[in-house]
């Protein structure tokens, strides 16, 4: 049985095709002000991704609330096998390709697969790549990431190419939540050129100017999380920069 591209992924592909780039906002369900964040971003984000540790409030309840508040596609970004709920629209079905621990490469997604099928969730097959300085962040520590050095962009490119050969349609270049600096432009460009699949970039993107650069370098999706928690109003300017970069990129590509 061949898994077909679902409604959420089709919608996202259309946004990328028409706008040149999409903007995802990451909401940690453990944040007490997740309702406030959802209200602030609903008119600016193209999709919401939910990820992080789960505290007192259940993931089911948080996901349902965020869907009701925003009216946007809600995509799970699970930190482990328990980070799945039937209330979501889709899930980033991912492998942390450069983890030193096979649990994060293959065991965790395998353990979660039956639950995802049971819930009827749409899957977005994705390679998750930990990029320097991710080892200094929580995800780098927990995921035992063998981080890809920023000065070796070709390594990320080859991983991305490998992901495309495995049939994945998305690559997430992740510097880590609250990272000191983002994934560099050359690495984004090489990853896009070699793989030809959708490139998501997150971690350390704090200004609209940096987001613009990342899109022009080849990013199809920009993700912000920590920024959104600290300054929900910043998403308005971030969206403007991402969409401007997307249109500028489309114009540039049309001339080639």
Swiss-Prot record:
Matching InterPro entries: GGGP/HepGP_synthase_sf, GGGP_HepGP_synthase, GGGP_synth, IGPS_HisA/HisF
Functional pathway: Membrane lipid metabolism; glycerophospholipid metabolism
EC number: 2.5.1.41
Function: Prenyltransferase that catalyzes the transfer of the geranylgeranyl moiety of geranylgeranyl diphosphate (GGPP) to the C3 hydroxyl of sn-glycerol-1-phosphate (G1P). This reaction is the first ether-bond-formation step in the biosynthesis of archaeal membrane lipids.
Reaction equation(s) it catalyzes: sn-glycerol 1-phosphate + (2E,6E,10E)-geranylgeranyl diphosphate = sn-3-O-(geranylgeranyl)glycerol 1-phosphate + diphosphate
Single GO cellular component term: cytoplasm
Protein name: Geranylgeranylglyceryl phosphate synthase
Species annotation: Methanococcus maripaludis (strain C7 / ATCC BAA-1331)
Gene3D superfamilies found in the cross-reference section: FMN-linked oxidoreductases
One GO biological process term: glycerophospholipid biosynthetic process
């Amino acid at each position: 049985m061949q898994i077909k591209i679902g409604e959420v992924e089709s919608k996202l592909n259309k946004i990328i095709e028409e706008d040149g780039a999409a903007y995802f906002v990451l909401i940690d369900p453990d944040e007490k002000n997740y309702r406030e964040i959802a209200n602030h971003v609903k008119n600016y984000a193209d999709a919401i991704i939910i990820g992080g540790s789960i505290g007192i409030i259940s993931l089911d309840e948080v996901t349902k609330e965020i869907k009701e508040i925003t009216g946007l596609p809600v995509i799970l970004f699970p930190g482990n096998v328990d980070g799945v709920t039937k209330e979501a629209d889709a899930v980033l079905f991912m492998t942390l390709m450069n983890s030193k621990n096979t649990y994060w490469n293959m065991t965790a997604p395998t353990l979660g697969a039956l639950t995802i099928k049971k819930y009827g969730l749409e899957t977005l097959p994705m390679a998750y790549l930990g990029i320097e300085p991710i080892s200094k962040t929580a995800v780098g520590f927990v995921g035992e990431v063998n981080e890809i050095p920023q000065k070796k962009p070709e390594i990320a490119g080859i991983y991305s190419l490998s992901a495309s050969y495995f049939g994945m349609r998305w690559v997430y270049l992740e510097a880590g939540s609250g990272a000191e600096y983002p994934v560099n432009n050359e690495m984004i460009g090489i990853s896009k050129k070699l793989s030809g699949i959708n490139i998501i970039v997150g971690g350390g993107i704090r200004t609209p100017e940096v987001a613009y650069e990342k899109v022009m370098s080849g990013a199809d999706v920009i993700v912000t999380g920590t920024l959104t928690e600290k300054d929900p109003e910043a998403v308005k300017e971030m969206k403007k920069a991402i969409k401007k970069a997307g249109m500028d990129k489309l114009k540039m590509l049309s001339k080639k």
